[in-house]
Amino acid sequence: MTYDFDALTDRSGTYSLKWEEAGDALPMWVADMDFTTAPPIREAMRRRLDHGVFGYSIVPDEWRQAYIGWWRDRHGVTFERESLIFCTGVIPAISSMVRKLTTPAENVVIQTPVYNIFFNSILNNGRNVLEAPLTYDAAAGRYAIDWEDLERKLADPQTTLMILCNPHNPSGQIWDRGTLTRLGELCWEHHVTVISDEIHCDLTDPGFEYVPFSSVSEHCRMNSVTCIAPTKTFNLAGLQTAAVMVPDPVLRHKVWRGLNTDEVAEPNAFAITAAVAAFTEGGPWLDELRAYLAGNKRAVRAAVDEYNASVDTARRVTLVEGDATYLLWLDCSALTDDTERLCDHLFAEQRLMLSPGAQFGGNGRYFVRINAATQRERVDEGMRRLTAGLRSFR
């Protein structure tokens, strides 16, 4: 490998949410990575820093071309230049769109278990969360859409918006073209706009590709807003740089108005520089990162398999089969129906910090989410602590 992902990083003193909240525990919870970002990004930011003047920034065409080139070359999708709008983050954009595209007390559909901040973006704006729970096949370790339930909820006249997580967080599943097409047609039929959060799209396992929602049909393209960013992929969450892609001009104008009204459409001094460097020079680093993360996920699976082989069937756990993200979703239903209690136990006894699943809705209370985006040494130590904690949990 050209890049040393095994090199331990010390994030103490950097005001890291992930590490400061954990104290002396090993944090494998919030979704950021413990790797330094790609060298071309650091070099571009260093040049910008050395300039020494940090006034207001514009959004140049170079930024749009960086996004267009990346999605064309990596995902085979062509974005129109005018369809791209800068925003300071995917969640600020989603919250803004919930306000702009719906009215108070209308329903916003989400497929649970799903990224917990979706709930905040809906409830904090006075809209109703309408869960369309995914069905779970425990034997296969996979989720699927309950089409009858989803259509019933989309058909409710009070339902005007759906937030899709593609690829899915926390399960790591990649939605296939057929699934996305069917979902898009239902939303079109029932006049429900789709926000597709695709922030994890570049973090697929080697050999797997995600399918952009807007690419599967004209209805999906014209009835959706796609949220994208370099932040998850290149570990830039603290730089507040993202984009929304909106092909339909009428919908685009509404989204643009909302983002500007909410003052989340102006870049800071480093946002453009980092994004352009990521999407024009970050490919080789990302390919090695994906391979490294796949190795980390194999290490987690091996530890789970070893644990399962050493305990009674009644105490075994199951990893959901995911092909994207660095997050793993662990089914602990044989041990508890309250993984908040399990996570408290792991934190107190093993000094290991994981995410309890109840916050993701649906059947999440039976699961914990594991962040494997750290050095292999820490992954191995985390799995040692996890399996020891599972054995002692009662």
For every predicted segment, state its role.
Residues E218, M222-A294, L390:
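Conserved core segment of the aminotransferase class I/II
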Residues V276, Y292-R301, L319-C332, G364:
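Conserved glycine-rich beta-strand-loop-beta hairpin in the small C-terminal domain of fold type I
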Residues C220, T336, H345-L354, F360-R394:
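PLP-dependent enzyme catalytic core of the Aspartate aminotransferase-like
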Residues F54-E185, D202-L203, Y210-S215, H219, ...:
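Conserved core of the PLP fold type I
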Residues T2-G89, S96, A278-E281, F393-R394:
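N-terminal small-domain helix-loop-helix segment of the aminotransferase-like
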